[in-house]
């Protein structure tokens, strides 16, 4: 059977611009599964830049270990399955179902050299081949828009790491191929709604046209209030007490003294009920505006957060790839009534900038980011664009830097992500040894925490953030995970305090959204 490649047809209309994407998401998606809200804001001024909402998904792509599951959610998406069948290499076993495919990939050979391993057949080929099923229209971006998450544990498919318990339903990766995408440009104050047609069926085209008009009409109607359900008391629990966490930190410092590692990032989990996730996200966004904000509504879980830290960013026009390491954290300087004390805040910043431990930790991670880019960038193209800048958020301030390089012409964004995961600010250095140590002491999969969320397109544009300052919600229970970077000079109690400070913005947002008083 010949694989006939059709051009993606984009159906597009303009809607009424609204400044709050969260209320639009509530109006158009409500509790619809496989929907995603991505927001971005300026780091310094916190002004909104662009927001994107996947209103309808054509496909849901998820993986666990070496098995990828592709679910067609519409007839439009289903047409891509048949095209994909004809492109799969013989080394990939394809199990066919009426509305889905289960792809079983060969395990990575760990005995071959790093470059060959990077280019081996892998679960990332699912995305490469899906993009190849269609001709891409010229001068149109986002005609194939994939939004979703890569979990921290995805790295286990590519590196020999300990096998850990899986206590949550979070897959190794979970992405949606957008069928209907809403794009808000907050600078131009416009709203574009577009649908991607992946076949030539007139019935599907008419369905998408009708859907676009219905969405446009909905945007003119009264906006429903975001659900706000009260919980009288919230019990906040943690999987590790300060005493237990400090004990782990001390043991990890022994590994640093032995020379096994230079740095490591142990984490702990805070648990609390959350039945109004979108309300909690809205509160988090208001109290802690960040460069990356996200709300992912899956069939198995909800994930929301406001992350300060980019994971990997790639611009296909300039070929530039960026990493934005954050290391060095202090609480904001506040008065007794919770307002920012500018004088105290500046003193805390100065202390952080002059602190030898914070600077050595930060520069170590800058070097690690440079080494990550060295594997995938053209020789001589790497440079440090900014060094030890301070970014401020509601509860904490951070030391940040930016490292830039030009991606090699024979590599793509998936090679780049594979080479760089997981980011050193969530693992430590050397990465593999640090991740082994994390597995030994944390004893369970991290799931979404420390992975990344964002989007990529058919043109290779790629923008993701590290999943921190976030809540993973499953069965109405939120898990808020936070860690601290440990080096030789670390003071264990201070690191325990830091992990709690990092979790506070999300915990407070959840408590506020449910109008509750915290019970520790």
From Swiss-Prot:
Its EC number is 4.1.3.27. L-tryptophan binds at residues 40, 291-293. This is Anthranilate synthase component 1. It comes from Buchnera aphidicola subsp. Pemphigus spyrothecae. Heterotetramer consisting of two non-identical subunits: a beta subunit (TrpG) and a large alpha subunit (TrpE). The keyword Amino-acid biosynthesis applies. Feedback inhibited by tryptophan. Keywords: Amino-acid biosynthesis, Aromatic amino acid biosynthesis, Lyase, Magnesium, Metal-binding, Plasmid, Tryptophan biosynthesis.
């Amino acid at each position: 059977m010949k694989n006939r490649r059709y051009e993606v047809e984009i159906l597009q209309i303009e809607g009424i611009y609204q400044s709050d994407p969260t209320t639009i998401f509530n109006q158009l998606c409500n509790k619809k599964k496989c929907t995603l809200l991505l927001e971005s804001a300026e780091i310094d001024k916190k002004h909104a830049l662009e927001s994107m909402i996947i209103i309808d998904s054509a496909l849901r792509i998820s993986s666990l270990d070496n098995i990828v599951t592709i679910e067609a959610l519409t007839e439009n998406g289903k047409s891509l399955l048949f095209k994909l069948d004809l492109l799969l290499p013989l080394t990939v076993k394809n199990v066919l179902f009426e509305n889905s495919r289960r792809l079983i990939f060969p395990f990575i050979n760990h005995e071959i050299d790093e470059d060959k391993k990077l280019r081996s057949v892998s679960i990332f080929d699912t995305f490469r081949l899906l993009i190849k099923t269609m001709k891409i229209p010229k001068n149109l971006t986002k005609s194939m828009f994939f939004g979703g998450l890569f979990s921290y544990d995805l790295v286990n498919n590519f590196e020999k790491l300990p096998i850990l318990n899986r206590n949550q339903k979070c897959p190794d990766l979970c992405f949606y191929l957008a069928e209907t995408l809403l794009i808000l440009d907050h600078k131009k104050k416009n709203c574009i709604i577009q649908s991607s047609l992946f076949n030539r069926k007139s019935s599907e085209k008419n369905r998408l046209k009708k859907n676009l008009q219905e969405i446009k009409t909905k945007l003119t109607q009264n906006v429903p209030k975001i659900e706000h359900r009260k919980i009288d008391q919230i019990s906040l629990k943690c999987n590790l007490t300060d005493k237990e966490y400090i004990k782990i930190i001390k043991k990890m410092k022994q590994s640093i003294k032995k020379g096994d590692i230079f740095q490591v990032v142990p984490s702990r989990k805070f648990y609390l009920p959350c039945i109004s996730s979108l309300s909690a996200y809205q509160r988090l966004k208001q109290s802690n505006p960040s460069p990356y904000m996200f709300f992912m509504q899956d069939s198995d879980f909800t994930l929301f957060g406001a992350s300060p830290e980019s994971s990997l960013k790639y611009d296909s026009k300039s070929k530039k790839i960026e990493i934005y390491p954050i290391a060095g954290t202090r609480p904001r300087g506040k008065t007794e009534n919770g307002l920012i004390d500018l004088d105290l805040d500046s003193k805390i910043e100065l202390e952080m900038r002059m602190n030898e431990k914070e600077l050595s930790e930060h520069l170590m991670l800058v070097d690690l980011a440079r080494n990550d880019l060295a594997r995938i960038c053209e020789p001589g193209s790497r440079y440090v664009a900014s060094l030890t800048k301070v970014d401020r958020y509601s509860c904490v301030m951070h030391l940040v830097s930016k490292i830039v390089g030009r991606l090699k012409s024979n590599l793509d964004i998936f090679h780049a992500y594979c080479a760089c995961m997981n980011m050193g600010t969530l693992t430590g250095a050397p990465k593999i040894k640090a991740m082994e140590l994390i597995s030994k002491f944390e004893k369970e999969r991290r799931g979404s925490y420390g992975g990344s969320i964002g989007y990529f397109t058919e043109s290779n544009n790629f923008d993701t953030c590290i999943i921190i300052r976030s809540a993973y919600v499953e069965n109405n229970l939120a898990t808020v995970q936070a860690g601290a970077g440990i080096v030789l000079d670390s003071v264990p109690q201070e690191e325990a305090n830091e992990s709690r400070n990092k979790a506070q913005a999300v915990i407070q947002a959840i408590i506020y959204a449910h109008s509750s008083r915290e019970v520790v």
